[in-house]
Amino acid sequence: MPILGDATVIAGLLSRSTSNALRVQLTTPDGTELAHAQQKGGAAVLLGFKNGGKSDYTLSSAAGEELRIAVAGTTTITNQNTPLGRIVPSDGAARFEDGGGTVLAVGQPLTGFKADSAWHHRIMSPAGQELGVLTLMRAHTGWRDIEEEAYQLLLNYNVTSLKAPSYGALLKLSAPVPSQLGDVLAAACVDFSVLPRGYIA
């Protein structure tokens, strides 16, 4: 079962569990949870020393599917130890690849300025067609730049006492995407939020 299904607007809301592990909830504008990712625990996480950056996450869909995301310079995504995809930095941008290295889509460098509270990255198909935009929320005010429908997601957004690496991510697609690309983009919402990853030309 694909994680995104037919959803075209997905918010990745970043919070913490009681054990201090980062948690990213992927929801639609009406509040439906598509999946949630949980950082692998440990003493460094519990004590607040591992606050984002390179780490392992489990992305669990509402249908029970689990993906493992190893967030790093090149992020790998696996499904039951089978490579599903990778997020690879490339020329100031990112490639979204399948498990065999075939490019599914490309994330372009941010449009705007480094000081912006929201960094917008256009997502293009290998043929150059725009598929959507993945936005990294660098500040709480970044959500204000988003249209009202998606901004409603912020109403239930909790700001934790331990500073988070970002304020989440928003994925807006022009149309539903194939399931494999959808799963990689769901993982990208986690990756962008917790690394936090932004691409600058």
Report the location of each language-model feature:
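Hydrophobic/aromatic-rich structural module bridging two neighboring secondary-structure elements via a short loop
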Residues: 55-83, 89
